[in-house]
Protein backbone atom coordinates (compact mmCIF):
# COMPACT_ATOMS: atom_id res chain seq x y z
CA UNK A 1 0.00 0.00 0.00
CA UNK A 2 1.24 3.49 -0.88
CA UNK A 3 -0.15 7.01 -1.05
CA UNK A 4 -0.02 9.18 -4.14
CA UNK A 5 -0.48 12.97 -4.03
CA UNK A 6 -3.52 14.35 -5.85
CA UNK A 7 -3.65 18.02 -6.88
CA UNK A 8 -6.54 20.50 -6.99
CA UNK A 9 -6.36 24.15 -8.07
CA UNK A 10 -8.32 27.07 -6.62
CA UNK A 11 -8.30 30.82 -7.20
CA UNK A 12 -8.79 33.66 -4.73
CA UNK A 13 -9.82 36.97 -6.29
CA UNK A 14 -9.13 40.31 -4.60
CA UNK A 15 -10.10 43.85 -5.60
CA UNK A 16 -6.94 45.47 -6.98
CA UNK A 17 -8.55 48.77 -8.03
CA UNK A 18 -6.94 50.62 -5.10
CA UNK A 19 -3.51 49.40 -6.15
CA UNK A 20 -2.97 47.48 -2.88
CA UNK A 21 -1.97 43.83 -3.07
CA UNK A 22 -2.92 41.83 0.03
CA UNK A 23 -0.23 39.60 1.54
CA UNK A 24 -0.83 36.12 2.92
CA UNK A 25 -0.05 35.69 6.64
CA UNK A 26 -1.28 32.17 7.27
CA UNK A 27 -2.65 29.14 5.38
CA UNK A 28 -4.51 26.18 6.89
CA UNK A 29 -6.48 23.05 6.02
CA UNK A 30 -9.44 22.19 8.27
CA UNK A 31 -12.53 20.04 7.81
CA UNK A 32 -13.75 20.57 4.24
CA UNK A 33 -12.24 24.03 3.79
CA UNK A 34 -9.01 25.88 3.07
CA UNK A 35 -8.19 29.01 5.05
CA UNK A 36 -5.95 31.82 3.77
CA UNK A 37 -5.26 34.83 6.01
CA UNK A 38 -4.67 38.00 4.00
CA UNK A 39 -3.66 41.50 5.08
CA UNK A 40 -3.94 44.79 3.18
CA UNK A 41 -3.23 48.43 4.07
CA UNK A 42 -6.28 48.60 6.34
CA UNK A 43 -4.25 46.84 9.03
CA UNK A 44 -7.10 44.42 9.52
CA UNK A 45 -6.78 40.75 8.66
CA UNK A 46 -9.21 38.86 6.47
CA UNK A 47 -9.72 35.10 6.46
CA UNK A 48 -10.60 33.76 3.00
CA UNK A 49 -12.39 30.41 3.25
CA UNK A 50 -12.47 28.09 0.22
CA UNK A 51 -15.06 25.30 0.13
CA UNK A 52 -13.18 22.43 -1.55
CA UNK A 53 -16.38 20.76 -2.80
CA UNK A 54 -17.59 23.81 -4.76
CA UNK A 55 -14.45 25.93 -5.16
CA UNK A 56 -16.39 28.97 -3.91
CA UNK A 57 -14.91 31.21 -1.26
CA UNK A 58 -16.21 33.53 1.43
CA UNK A 59 -14.55 36.15 3.62
CA UNK A 60 -14.51 37.05 7.30
CA UNK A 61 -12.98 40.24 8.64
CA UNK A 62 -10.97 39.64 11.83
CA UNK A 63 -10.55 42.03 14.76
CA UNK A 64 -7.03 43.19 13.97
CA UNK A 65 -3.70 41.87 12.74
CA UNK A 66 -2.07 38.91 14.50
CA UNK A 67 0.07 35.81 14.09
CA UNK A 68 -2.14 32.75 13.56
CA UNK A 69 -1.83 29.13 14.68
CA UNK A 70 -3.79 25.92 14.24
CA UNK A 71 -4.77 24.45 17.64
CA UNK A 72 -6.52 21.36 18.96
CA UNK A 73 -9.81 23.27 19.06
CA UNK A 74 -9.56 25.42 15.92
CA UNK A 75 -7.27 28.43 15.57
CA UNK A 76 -5.64 31.13 17.68
CA UNK A 77 -4.31 34.61 16.95
CA UNK A 78 -1.51 36.11 19.08
CA UNK A 79 -0.86 39.83 19.41
CA UNK A 80 -0.04 42.33 22.16
CA UNK A 81 -0.02 39.93 25.13
CA UNK A 82 -3.38 38.48 24.10
CA UNK A 83 -4.41 35.18 22.52
CA UNK A 84 -7.69 35.31 20.57
CA UNK A 85 -9.42 31.93 20.28
CA UNK A 86 -11.36 30.91 17.16
CA UNK A 87 -13.38 27.78 16.43
CA UNK A 88 -12.99 25.58 13.33
CA UNK A 89 -15.00 28.09 11.26
CA UNK A 90 -12.77 30.98 12.40
CA UNK A 91 -15.53 32.46 14.55
CA UNK A 92 -14.21 34.13 17.70
CA UNK A 93 -15.01 32.19 20.88
CA UNK A 94 -12.87 33.89 23.51
CA UNK A 95 -9.61 35.52 24.60
CA UNK A 96 -6.78 34.65 26.97
CA UNK A 97 -4.96 37.53 28.66
CA UNK A 98 -1.25 36.67 28.81
CA UNK A 99 -0.09 40.00 30.26
CA UNK A 100 0.56 38.67 33.80
CA UNK A 101 2.46 35.66 32.43
CA UNK A 102 4.60 37.89 30.19
CA UNK A 103 5.20 40.37 33.05
CA UNK A 104 6.38 37.45 35.20
CA UNK A 105 8.87 36.48 32.48
CA UNK A 106 10.11 40.06 32.10
CA UNK A 107 10.59 40.40 35.86
CA UNK A 108 12.86 37.35 35.84
CA UNK A 109 14.91 38.72 32.95
CA UNK A 110 13.26 36.57 30.28
CA UNK A 111 11.22 37.52 27.23
CA UNK A 112 8.69 35.76 25.03
CA UNK A 113 10.09 35.17 21.53
CA UNK A 114 7.94 33.29 19.02
CA UNK A 115 9.46 32.42 15.65
CA UNK A 116 7.17 30.17 13.59
CA UNK A 117 3.64 28.92 13.09
CA UNK A 118 3.97 25.76 15.15
CA UNK A 119 5.04 27.43 18.39
CA UNK A 120 1.61 27.89 20.02
CA UNK A 121 -1.12 25.31 20.44
CA UNK A 122 -4.02 24.54 22.78
CA UNK A 123 -5.87 21.44 23.99
CA UNK A 124 -9.62 21.00 24.52
CA UNK A 125 -9.29 21.96 28.22
CA UNK A 126 -7.80 25.34 27.35
CA UNK A 127 -4.19 24.55 28.31
CA UNK A 128 -1.79 26.50 26.08
CA UNK A 129 1.69 25.43 25.00
CA UNK A 130 4.09 28.19 23.92
CA UNK A 131 7.64 27.66 22.65
CA UNK A 132 9.82 30.72 23.26
CA UNK A 133 13.16 31.42 21.59
CA UNK A 134 13.21 27.82 20.33
CA UNK A 135 14.56 26.63 23.69
CA UNK A 136 11.82 26.84 26.35
CA UNK A 137 8.28 25.43 26.49
CA UNK A 138 5.87 27.36 28.72
CA UNK A 139 2.55 25.75 29.67
CA UNK A 140 -0.19 28.23 30.57
CA UNK A 141 -3.75 27.48 31.70
CA UNK A 142 -6.97 28.95 30.27
CA UNK A 143 -6.65 31.95 32.62
CA UNK A 144 -3.13 32.82 31.50
CA UNK A 145 -1.46 31.40 34.62
CA UNK A 146 1.90 29.63 34.21
CA UNK A 147 1.64 25.87 34.84
CA UNK A 148 5.17 24.69 34.05
CA UNK A 149 8.28 25.32 32.01
CA UNK A 150 10.49 22.88 30.12
CA UNK A 151 13.96 23.57 28.77
CA UNK A 152 15.39 22.04 25.60
CA UNK A 153 17.38 18.87 26.51
CA UNK A 154 21.14 19.41 26.73
CA UNK A 155 21.86 16.96 23.91
CA UNK A 156 19.51 18.78 21.50
CA UNK A 157 19.99 22.16 19.83
CA UNK A 158 16.44 23.56 19.78
CA UNK A 159 12.72 22.96 20.33
CA UNK A 160 11.15 23.10 16.87
CA UNK A 161 7.49 22.85 17.88
CA UNK A 162 4.94 21.75 20.46
CA UNK A 163 1.78 19.76 19.69
CA UNK A 164 -1.00 17.88 21.47
CA UNK A 165 -2.84 14.76 20.28
CA UNK A 166 -6.61 14.39 20.20
CA UNK A 167 -6.38 12.29 23.39
CA UNK A 168 -4.54 15.09 25.19
CA UNK A 169 -0.95 13.80 25.05
CA UNK A 170 1.60 16.61 24.76
CA UNK A 171 4.91 16.43 22.85
CA UNK A 172 7.77 18.67 21.86
CA UNK A 173 9.81 18.09 18.69
CA UNK A 174 13.52 18.80 19.13
CA UNK A 175 16.23 19.24 16.52
CA UNK A 176 19.61 17.61 17.14
CA UNK A 177 23.14 18.87 16.77
CA UNK A 178 23.30 17.45 13.23
CA UNK A 179 20.97 18.67 10.46
CA UNK A 180 17.93 16.40 10.12
CA UNK A 181 18.30 14.71 13.54
CA UNK A 182 14.88 14.89 15.17
CA UNK A 183 13.64 13.52 18.51
CA UNK A 184 10.07 13.56 19.90
CA UNK A 185 9.65 13.94 23.69
CA UNK A 186 6.39 13.43 25.64
CA UNK A 187 5.74 16.24 28.15
CA UNK A 188 3.99 16.22 31.54
CA UNK A 189 2.38 19.66 31.39
CA UNK A 190 1.81 19.89 35.16
CA UNK A 191 5.44 19.26 36.16
CA UNK A 192 7.21 20.16 32.91
CA UNK A 193 9.20 16.91 32.94
CA UNK A 194 10.04 15.06 29.73
CA UNK A 195 9.59 11.36 29.00
CA UNK A 196 12.01 9.20 27.03
CA UNK A 197 12.89 10.59 23.62
CA UNK A 198 11.58 8.82 20.51
CA UNK A 199 14.42 8.87 17.98
CA UNK A 200 13.34 6.46 15.23
CA UNK A 201 10.11 8.07 14.05
CA UNK A 202 11.65 9.71 10.96
CA UNK A 203 13.95 8.20 8.36
CA UNK A 204 15.23 9.26 4.94
CA UNK A 205 16.89 12.55 4.01
CA UNK A 206 15.87 16.20 4.47
CA UNK A 207 13.63 15.36 7.42
CA UNK A 208 13.30 18.67 9.24
CA UNK A 209 9.76 18.63 10.67
CA UNK A 210 7.53 21.47 9.46
CA UNK A 211 4.16 20.49 10.96
CA UNK A 212 2.23 17.84 12.91
CA UNK A 213 -1.44 16.91 12.39
CA UNK A 214 -3.14 14.78 15.10
CA UNK A 215 -5.53 12.02 14.00
CA UNK A 216 -7.74 9.51 15.90
CA UNK A 217 -6.67 9.35 19.57
CA UNK A 218 -2.88 9.41 19.96
CA UNK A 219 -1.76 8.98 16.33
CA UNK A 220 -0.46 11.88 14.26
CA UNK A 221 0.75 12.74 10.77
CA UNK A 222 4.21 14.26 10.42
CA UNK A 223 5.15 16.63 7.60
CA UNK A 224 8.87 16.95 6.98
CA UNK A 225 10.38 18.86 4.08
CA UNK A 226 10.55 15.71 2.00
CA UNK A 227 8.21 13.08 3.48
CA UNK A 228 4.82 12.52 5.07
CA UNK A 229 4.64 9.94 7.88
CA UNK A 230 1.96 8.58 10.17
CA UNK A 231 2.91 7.76 13.75
CA UNK A 232 0.98 4.76 15.12
CA UNK A 233 0.78 4.99 18.91
CA UNK A 234 -0.36 1.39 19.49
CA UNK A 235 2.88 -0.02 18.06
CA UNK A 236 5.03 3.09 18.72
CA UNK A 237 6.15 2.99 15.08
CA UNK A 238 5.80 5.23 12.04
CA UNK A 239 5.02 4.51 8.41
CA UNK A 240 5.99 6.57 5.38
CA UNK A 241 3.07 7.73 3.25
CA UNK A 242 5.15 9.12 0.40
CA UNK A 243 8.24 11.07 -0.59
CA UNK A 244 6.92 14.50 -1.54
CA UNK A 245 9.67 15.57 -3.93
CA UNK A 246 9.31 12.35 -5.91
CA UNK A 247 5.84 13.73 -6.77
CA UNK A 248 6.90 17.34 -7.28
CA UNK A 249 5.59 18.73 -3.99
CA UNK A 250 7.68 21.56 -2.52
CA UNK A 251 7.21 22.27 1.19
CA UNK A 252 7.62 25.81 2.51
CA UNK A 253 8.08 27.42 -0.89
CA UNK A 254 7.69 30.89 0.71
CA UNK A 255 5.53 32.01 -2.22
CA UNK A 256 4.26 35.10 -0.37
CA UNK A 257 6.34 34.87 2.77
CA UNK A 258 3.89 32.38 4.26
CA UNK A 259 5.19 29.06 2.90
CA UNK A 260 2.84 26.08 3.09
CA UNK A 261 -0.23 25.30 5.17
CA UNK A 262 -1.26 21.97 6.66
CA UNK A 263 -4.23 20.34 8.37
CA UNK A 264 -6.76 17.52 8.48
CA UNK A 265 -9.87 16.87 6.42
CA UNK A 266 -13.04 15.32 7.80
CA UNK A 267 -12.02 11.91 6.40
CA UNK A 268 -8.92 11.90 8.67
CA UNK A 269 -6.49 12.44 5.82
CA UNK A 270 -3.89 15.22 5.84
CA UNK A 271 -3.65 17.98 3.26
CA UNK A 272 -1.11 20.57 2.12
CA UNK A 273 -1.99 24.00 0.73
CA UNK A 274 0.49 26.05 -1.30
CA UNK A 275 0.46 29.49 -2.91
CA UNK A 276 1.65 28.93 -6.50
CA UNK A 277 1.34 32.28 -8.29
CA UNK A 278 -0.82 35.28 -9.20
CA UNK A 279 -2.01 37.37 -12.11
CA UNK A 280 -3.89 40.64 -12.57
CA UNK A 281 -7.12 40.59 -14.58
CA UNK A 282 -8.43 44.15 -14.90
CA UNK A 283 -9.18 45.34 -11.37
CA UNK A 284 -8.94 41.80 -10.02
CA UNK A 285 -5.87 40.36 -8.32
CA UNK A 286 -6.10 36.56 -8.70
CA UNK A 287 -4.08 34.32 -6.37
CA UNK A 288 -3.53 30.69 -7.34
CA UNK A 289 -3.84 28.08 -4.58
CA UNK A 290 -2.87 24.42 -4.90
CA UNK A 291 -4.25 21.74 -2.59
CA UNK A 292 -2.39 18.43 -2.20
CA UNK A 293 -4.30 15.44 -0.84
CA UNK A 294 -3.25 11.80 -0.64
CA UNK A 295 -4.91 8.83 -2.35
CA UNK A 296 -4.22 5.18 -1.53
CA UNK A 297 -2.79 3.16 -4.41
CA UNK A 298 -1.91 -0.51 -4.65
CA UNK A 299 0.39 -2.73 -6.70
CA UNK A 300 1.83 -1.40 -9.94
CA UNK A 301 -0.30 1.73 -9.72
CA UNK A 302 2.03 2.94 -6.97
CA UNK A 303 5.27 2.10 -8.77
CA UNK A 304 7.28 4.46 -10.97
CA UNK A 305 10.84 4.20 -12.26
CA UNK A 306 13.49 6.42 -10.67
CA UNK A 307 15.81 8.40 -12.94
CA UNK A 308 18.97 9.63 -11.20
CA UNK A 309 20.45 12.97 -12.29
CA UNK A 310 24.14 13.19 -11.32
CA UNK A 311 25.22 16.75 -10.51
CA UNK A 312 28.51 18.26 -9.38
CA UNK A 313 26.71 20.88 -7.24
CA UNK A 314 23.23 21.51 -5.91
CA UNK A 315 20.71 22.09 -8.75
CA UNK A 316 19.68 25.65 -9.52
CA UNK A 317 16.17 26.93 -8.81
CA UNK A 318 15.19 26.65 -12.49
CA UNK A 319 16.55 23.11 -12.72
CA UNK A 320 14.72 22.04 -9.56
CA UNK A 321 11.51 23.74 -10.72
CA UNK A 322 11.62 21.83 -14.03
CA UNK A 323 12.24 18.53 -12.24
CA UNK A 324 9.36 19.19 -9.83
CA UNK A 325 6.98 19.73 -12.75
CA UNK A 326 8.21 16.48 -14.33
CA UNK A 327 7.76 14.55 -11.08
CA UNK A 328 4.29 15.97 -10.52
CA UNK A 329 2.80 14.99 -13.86
CA UNK A 330 4.76 12.02 -15.25
CA UNK A 331 2.92 8.75 -14.47
CA UNK A 332 5.86 6.42 -15.19
CA UNK A 333 9.08 8.12 -14.02
CA UNK A 334 10.45 10.49 -11.41
CA UNK A 335 13.84 12.23 -11.14
CA UNK A 336 16.09 12.44 -8.10
CA UNK A 337 19.36 14.35 -7.78
CA UNK A 338 22.60 12.74 -6.64
CA UNK A 339 25.16 15.43 -5.84
CA UNK A 340 28.88 14.59 -5.77
CA UNK A 341 30.57 17.78 -4.64
CA UNK A 342 33.04 17.11 -1.82
CA UNK A 343 36.75 16.90 -1.18
CA UNK A 344 36.87 13.29 -2.40
CA UNK A 345 35.34 14.08 -5.79
CA UNK A 346 38.53 13.44 -7.75
CA UNK A 347 39.14 10.00 -6.26
CA UNK A 348 38.63 6.99 -8.53
CA UNK A 349 35.82 5.69 -6.30
CA UNK A 350 33.90 8.98 -6.53
CA UNK A 351 34.39 9.22 -10.30
CA UNK A 352 32.97 5.72 -10.66
CA UNK A 353 29.87 6.64 -8.65
CA UNK A 354 29.31 9.69 -10.84
CA UNK A 355 29.72 7.56 -13.97
CA UNK A 356 27.17 5.00 -12.74
CA UNK A 357 24.68 7.71 -11.77
CA UNK A 358 24.95 9.40 -15.17
CA UNK A 359 24.57 6.05 -16.88
CA UNK A 360 21.36 5.31 -14.97
CA UNK A 361 20.03 8.79 -15.79
Named regions from a protein language model:
Residues 30, 43, 71, 79-81, ...:
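Short loop/turn segments that connect beta-strands within the blades of beta-propeller domains
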Residues 344-361:
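Pocket-flanking alpha-helical
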Residues 315-334:
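Short, polar/charged alpha-helical segment
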